[in-house]
Amino acid sequence: MSNPGFLLSIASVGLVLAATPVMAQTKPAGADVPAAPSTPAQSSLVVGALQIGSAPNLVVAGVDISVASDSIVYSYFFKNTGSAELDVAASVSLPELQASADRSETWALAANDPENPVGLTITAAGTPVTTQAEVHANALGIDRRTEIKAEHLPLIPFGAELDKAVAALSPDAADRLAALGVVSPRDPAQPKAPVMADWSLDVVRSWRQVLPPGKTTPIVVKFSPVKAQYALAKGDQEDLDDMKDEICLKPVVLSALQSRLKGSGAWKVTDISIAADLPSHWIDSSRPTLSVQKPKPDMIVAFCGMDEKTASRPTVLGAAPDDADEVRIVIFEPAAK
């Protein structure tokens, strides 16, 4: 849900505010290496919303989403209006992981775990839920986990561990994997240049959910967001104009953000996109409600569907717009020049 045009000019500021991520891919430094296309040093990805099977007596009583800079919590309330328990399938899709072709983007993951890189936890009525991982490492549409593991490559297709492993590939192994579409081909003109992972890692966590009769069961899904972090400084006023519609910036807020930049101030920006899909296509449900925690009182929060009356409070409230399957939430923190 990122805005490529906006992010293009952000990175030219040259300020990277994010701490070193657990797992990341970055462009290697070097005086003779041309600058990568301008993109944020740390980009965002969306974790899928919970999806659940249907049953005649299953009602979605509500969905609440709580957002903090380091944690997102979805609370689903499922009511079984019947006299017998329901047993339905449920799943959460984790974000697709794929290397940046030009090494210009990086993603901060909560854990170096290919089956759960976002630290996902799920509870039902307060009891931890055990999920099963459906994992695919797809190259040219074919699951190549066997070939990847045979060459001792990690499944996460970027990061320091991956870079070290592909650098250790023999020329024959690299050529064999390239022929399968698993890694990039070697460049004969630059035989020492490292190859890159060319597969995507797709993970779905699934389970069977039992819902007792006549009760409402809360299911809580919690994880660490894969967020973008960057800076805005003097000269970036037009970039705020470019993003105003996507996050529904009001004129007075836009003016305040731009005024700081005109006065040689800066903004540290945390940019998070969340899924706002309803849990079932076949069960009516109201739109998810949103609450966004401000890490500090002087920060500005912006997103479409925000309740403007809560903008100055420690917790900003709102609801996902009717036509949105994702909501982009941006938190602006005042920063020195």
What kind of region is each of these model predictions?
Residues S9-A19:
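Bacterial N-terminal signal peptides
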